[in-house]
Amino acid sequence: MIRLLTKSKAAIARLRAYQSPPFPLWDRLPATRRAAVLVLLYADRAGELRVVITMRSATLRNFSGQAAFPGGKADSVDESPYQIARREAWEEIGLPMDDSKIPAPFVIENLCYLPHSLARTGLVVRPCVAFLHPDPTKVDGSELPNVDETLIPRLDAKEVAAVFSAPFHNFLKAQDEETGPVPSGQWYEGRWTDYNDYRWRLHYFYVPIDRQRVTRPKEREGGQAALAEPEESAPEVRFKVWGMTGRMLVDAARLAYGEEPEFEHNEDYGDEKMINELESQILETKL
């Protein structure tokens, strides 16, 4: 059975205990300005935490072809951020919204919310961190199925081009942390930029995918999406993860592991100070 490493257990415990500061502006936002993403963690066979990431379809209007967490806009103001994130994860990668439909023996635990971020489209985005793990009451001591093969089985070809995972702790490191041979190329680079008159650290991570099963959509006749088939190999050897997603990964890893990154970064978690100062523009969608 898969056992969490001590540092992975401690990371989950920190996230479970974390409480983000109050953010009253969220309640004043219309549904059209609200969004949420699912930062889904799970343990690999070595007990290390990995995080699920998608590549957005090239056909999407916003952020096409970029790496992102499963997530999207609110349907109504009655949806909680976690409900938004879980609904979008169902639509994008087939992760059931109903916990009772998660394949046994797995459960999804909502660990915490991270402080809000501001997308270039003016959406206020709430990251929801969750942990996919076996339910102790359903484990009989036998070998657990591989999460990559069991829990990410279906894609929506209209929204997702690929689903892959990345080593969570590595988002605090300037170089590849995985053991064994890795494909050529760097893991990290970064630069400072100006974002709404704020200095904002732009992180670029290049995630190796040569030793994992990357799930992609398969097209039925007529262009309709069918069951996705995992590919043992792909032309790419690294996927670029950057922008708001990269910033959220750094923030989440900092909180989880209680460590600071090996590279320069923004001290604040999220963009809540910026969002509060830009409230009128956000509400008027002038960003």
Kindly give the residue locations of the regions a language model identified.
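N-terminal leader/linker segments that precede catalytic domains of diphosphate-processing enzymes
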Residues: M1-V160, A166-L287
